[in-house]
């Protein structure tokens, strides 16, 4: 039988790690800080990729691929950018190994030292803007809307599967525009695409906002963010979109002739989402029984489990199960038939519950005789007997209902764990006893932001775009505040 999971209440961190391993999403790799994404976990990422890629292309973006290696001199061109990533950069210094004299080992060949060291891509602004210099001459070349699907390396010291690893997968968009207004509009458009993706596919209510100057992306004029609240009350930054101004254009001399015939620098944006979203799915929706997946990104939306005692029953039920599976697939429903004999139905029920499959279908002798099936929802464990001639309509409706329920549940959790405070004492009590999102006034200074973090471990998650902007006084200094910001303890 399946070993029982630790509960969320007992140890949230262990519960999270065990779900990822036992549901076969990922595992720690031989290289410290790296992970191996297993086929089931990668299938979720592929679903996310397909949905996002379609949305990007619908808004005029094209995919390209740029080198993983970046000359160190490129990073020096944008001082704020390099400062933000310097401590996380992996550096290539040599290009060849050689065998030792006894032939027992390989060592770095000292004669193969690179003239210029190469940085393993932590993000691609510098290498991409170097290309844009050659691609853009006139306003007719704008806007330039490019996306890249790739891996990046950031040498994290404290790692956690999906949430923070030395290497991870992501998409990074990089665009160039003729005007400031167009670039700002692009950054907000991509933020909204991310937020809609969260609601419509991940069933996660993302809070949209602006990062403070202290939390802003290195080299950006403005960073927009989507923040999610996990079941342990911690915040998770799920994606960001940056208005870069003309910083990278000036650093890499990316100019264009505008419609007035004058030479000007282009305006830029960059934006990205990562495999961290799989971690967000786990922590937002899953329960003490295992993974719970939103249907629209689930690799298997429905699993069919035949139940039989005799060979005669097996053949008839398998035939019916195969027929239903083919019907479901024909209607774009991802259906798996588990006809393995080495495991009993009860074992299979537990297996697919652990793996978060949205719907389980059981077909036994009585179902065959009555032309029915039994459907069980993963989110509520509710069982329903359904006539087979109505199966497509019912399954489609149930998948939508599961998505809506997961979203509503996550939204209500966020609302119930969002607190408004008016004093620093209230703030400290809320952050230590309740966690969640804390709405509080802040005076707008980095110093106050740092002091609050030092004393409570809480950071400003964002200046919200969708919350009442009434002025007040800072909870820490008593100085004037333009609006409440969202604090939280974060991953």
Curated annotation (Swiss-Prot):
Its BP terms in the Gene Ontology are: prolyl-tRNA aminoacylation
Q: Which PROSITE patterns match?
A: AA_TRNA_LIGASE_II
In alphabetical order, the GO MF annotations are: ATP binding; proline-tRNA ligase activity
Assigned EC number:
6.1.1.15
**GO cellular component terms, semicolon-separated:** aminoacyl-tRNA synthetase multienzyme complex; cytoplasm
InterPro entries, alphabetized: aa-tRNA-synt_IIb, aa-tRNA-synth_II, aa-tRNA-synth_II/BPL/LPL, Anticodon-bd, Anticodon-bd_dom_sf, Pro-tRNA-ligase_IIa_arc-type, Pro-tRNA_ligase_II_C, Pro-tRNA_synth_II
Could you name the domain of life of the organism this protein comes from? Bacteria
According to its UniProt record, this protein's enzyme class is ligase
Q: Please write the reaction equations for the catalytic activity of this protein.
A: tRNA(Pro) + L-proline + ATP = L-prolyl-tRNA(Pro) + AMP + diphosphate
Annotated localization: Cytoplasm
Q: Which UniProt keywords apply?
A: Aminoacyl-tRNA synthetase, ATP-binding, Cytoplasm, Ligase, Nucleotide-binding, Protein biosynthesis
- Tell whether Ligase is among the UniProt keywords: yes
Question: Mind telling me which Pfam families this protein's record contains?
Answer: HGTP_anticodon (PF03129), ProRS-C_1 (PF09180), tRNA-synt_2b (PF00587)
Subunit structure, per the record? Homodimer.
* Described purpose of this protein according to its UniProt entry: Catalyzes the attachment of proline to tRNA(Pro) in a two-step reaction: proline is first activated by ATP to form Pro-AMP and then transferred to the acceptor end of tRNA(Pro).
Query: Which family is annotated?
Result: Belongs to the class-II aminoacyl-tRNA synthetase family. ProS type 3 subfamily.
- Please name the PANTHER family in this protein's record: BIFUNCTIONAL GLUTAMATE_PROLINE--TRNA LIGASE, PROLYL-TRNA SYNTHETASE
Domain text: Consists of three domains: the N-terminal catalytic domain, the anticodon-binding domain and the C-terminal extension.
Query: What is the designated name of this protein?
Result: Proline--tRNA ligase
The record lists the organism as Amoebophilus asiaticus (strain 5a2)
């Amino acid at each position: 039988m399946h070993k029982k999971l630790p509960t969320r209440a007992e140890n949230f961190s262990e519960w999270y790690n065990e779900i990822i391993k036992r549901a076969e999403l990922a595992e720690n790799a031989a290289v410290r800080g790296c992970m191996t994404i297993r086929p089931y976990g990668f299938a979720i990422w592929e679903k996310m990729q397909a949905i996002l890629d379609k949305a990007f292309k619908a808004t005029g973006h094209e995919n390209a691929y740029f080198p993983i290696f970046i000359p160190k001199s490129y990073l020096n061109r944008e001082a704020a950018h390099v400062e933000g990533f310097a401590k996380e950069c992996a550096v290539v210094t040599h290009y060849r190994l050689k065998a030792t004299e006894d032939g027992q080992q390989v060592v770095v060949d000292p004669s193969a030292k690179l003239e210029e060291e190469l940085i393993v891509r932590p993000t691609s602004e510098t290498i991409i803007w170097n290309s844009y210099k050659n691609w853009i001459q006139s306003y007719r070349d704008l806007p330039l809307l490019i996306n890249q699907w790739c891996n990046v390396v950031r040498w994290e010291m404290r790692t956690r599967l999906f949430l923070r690893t030395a290497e991870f997968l992501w998409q990074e968009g990089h665009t160039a525009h003729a005007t400031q207004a167009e670039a700002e509009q692009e950054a907000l458009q991509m933020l909204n695409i991310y937020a809609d993706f969260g609601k419509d596919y991940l069933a996660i209510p993302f809070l949209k906002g602006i990062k403070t100057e202290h939390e802003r992306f290195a080299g950006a004029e403005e960073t927009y963010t989507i923040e999610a609240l996990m079941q342990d009350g911690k915040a998770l930054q799920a994606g960001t979109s940056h208005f870069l101004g003309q910083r990278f254009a000036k650093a890499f001399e990316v100019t264009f002739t505008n419609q007035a015939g004058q030479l000007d620098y282009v305006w830029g944006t960059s934006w990205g989402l990562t495999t961290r979203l799989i971690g967000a799915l786990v922590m937002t929706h899953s329960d003490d029984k295992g993974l719970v997946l939103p249907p629209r990104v689930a690799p298997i939306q429905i699993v069919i489990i035949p139940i039989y005692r005799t060979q005669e029953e097996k053949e008839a039920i398998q035939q019916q199960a195969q027929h239903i599976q083919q019907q479901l697939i024909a209607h774009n429903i991802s259906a798996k038939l588990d006809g393995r004999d080495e495991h009993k139905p009860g074992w299979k029920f537990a297996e697919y519950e652990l793996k978060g499959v949205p719907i389980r279908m059981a077909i036994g002798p009585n179902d065959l005789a009555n032309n029915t099936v039994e459907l069980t929802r993963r989110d509520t464990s509710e069982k329903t007997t359904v006539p087979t001639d109505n199966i497509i309509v019912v399954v489609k409706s149930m998948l939508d209902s599961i998505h809506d329920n997961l979203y509503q549940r996550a939204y209500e959790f966020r609302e119930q764990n969002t607190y408004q405070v008016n004093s620093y004492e209230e703030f400290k009590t809320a952050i230590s006893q309740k966690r969640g999102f804390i709405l509080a006034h802040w005076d707008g200074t980095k110093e106050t932001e740092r002091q609050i973090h030092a004393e409570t471990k809480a950071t400003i998650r964002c200046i919200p775009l969708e919350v009442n902007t009434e002025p007040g006084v800072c909870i820490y200094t008593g100085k004037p505040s333009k609006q409440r910001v969202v604090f939280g303890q974060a991953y």
